[in-house]
Amino acid sequence: MKKIKLNDEVIIITGKNKDSTGAVIKVLDSKVLVEGLNLAKKHVRSNPNAGVTGGITEIEVPLAVSNVAIYNSATKKADRVGIRTNKDGIKERFFKSNNEVIV
């Protein structure tokens, strides 16, 4: 079970966007895409046949998983994730600081 999943609220712990929070929109092997953060400018060539207008656009660039931490909204801080098996035998993720289950 992965510790960071799609739609998790994460906080960036290093780099130019440090202390910024956002939702995970894509999880790769060792990288994540965070909505609205770690933006890079991409030069796009116009293509009238495809209906693409040219110019400079901003896209989200993947961040290393080691540079983000899951955001605990109860404590308003970055937190660590643990994995345990509940009474029904189903694995669940929880915050290590206050033992709350991550929904």
From Swiss-Prot:
GO terms for cellular component: ribonucleoprotein complex; ribosome. Keywords: Ribonucleoprotein, Ribosomal protein, RNA-binding, rRNA-binding. It holds the Pfam family ribosomal_L24. The keyword Transmembrane helix does not apply. SMART domains: KOW. One of its GO terms (molecular function) is rRNA binding. It comes from the Bacteria. InterPro entries: KOW (IPR005824), Rib_uL2_dom2 (IPR014722), Ribosomal_uL24 (IPR003256), Ribosomal_uL24_KOW (IPR041988), Translation_prot_SH3-like_sf (IPR008991). The keyword Ribosomal protein applies. Belongs to the universal ribosomal protein uL24 family. One of two assembly initiator proteins, it binds directly to the 5'-end of the 23S rRNA, where it nucleates assembly of the 50S subunit. One of the proteins that surrounds the polypeptide exit tunnel on the outside of the subunit. This is Large ribosomal subunit protein uL24.
